[in-house]
Amino acid sequence: MVHEMDKTRLTTIAVVSMCDIHDPYIKIPDVVSYNHYFGWYGGDVSMNGPWFDKFHAEFPDIPIGVSEYGCEALNWHTSNPVQGDYTEEYQAYYHEEMIKQLFTRPYIWATHVWNMFDFGADARAEGGEDGQNHKGLVTFDRKYKKDSFYAYKAWLSEEAFVHICGKRYTDRAEEITRVTVYSNQPEVELFVNGKSIGKQKSPEHFFYFSVPNTGESVLTAVAGECRDESRIRKVDKFDEKYRLKEKGAVLNWFDITEKEGFYSLNDKMSDIMKSQKGKTLILGLLSGAGGPMGSKDSFINQENMASMMEMMGGFTLIRLLKLMGAANMSMTKEEMLDLNAKLNEIKKTE
């Protein structure tokens, strides 16, 4: 119909991850884009590039792009970012990886970050601040550019700059802390209290320094004529003000009992399912989510099983349970702890 009305107009479609690449409607528009959240809602961030390689290898004549990708970040911080923690550090890591995977594949016709700014979303209750989607590279009030904003600036802007990440993460407990710097200049030198700790070159525009963390330190990054400054301070233990504590959460990840060498709710789905006992436990759990396993009402059915299992592999089980809760398939705290106790009896598979 579109081509009948205007032969010069190209058509496109945005496709969600669960849609099989062999679905017939993929071939209807002139160009195609997928909404992929590998690394946030499912899977691992490393899955993105290979997925597009697979699509392009099978359909080299179909222009493929990314219509949505992103992850959420608020003013939470950590030195050990993980998927689903809502920290500025994980968002920065996620976008570093997405930039390296997407911007180096010339066959991808377009990429669309979701989103430039945090925005209102009345029904959402994530990350500790209700009513907003926090996938923006800039805060809702437009006053603070998150570190991930500067990752894109390093790749896309011709304006010379250097940026030290983690400015809102001052108090750190580790003896050696990692300091990340973004710049579109070829070389960055980092100074700690006026003393150089080294120079680095990076064609990827991301620079990582290991910094001794003692007392109070002034960090200065120099790239050509550009300078940026930040501060860190050594503390005895992790400051809980940096950690998200979900309001009304049935169970938080740090409340879960872990046994060395055994599984827990904090392990990834893909790791748990390496064990036959773990796989049986997980499939039994999912079989009761929404309807009988394989039925159209089930969380996983015959139509989406392969794609859903691929997506969920990067989830910790506690994160999956929270997403199921958001879809009105919640478990009580007692049920979660009982499930964790069962996992604590299953040895990890090498």
Locate predicted features:
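C2 and C2-like phospholipid-binding beta-sandwich domains
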Residues: 205-207
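Alpha-helix initiation/capping motif
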Residues: 44, 145-147, 235-239, 332-335
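Compact, charge-rich alpha-helical regulatory domains located at protein termini
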Residues: 253-336, 340-347
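Extended substrate-binding grooves/exosites of carbohydrate-active enzymes
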Residues: 1-201, 210-212, 217-218, 222-226
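Edge beta-strands of extracellular beta-sandwich domains
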Residues: 225-253
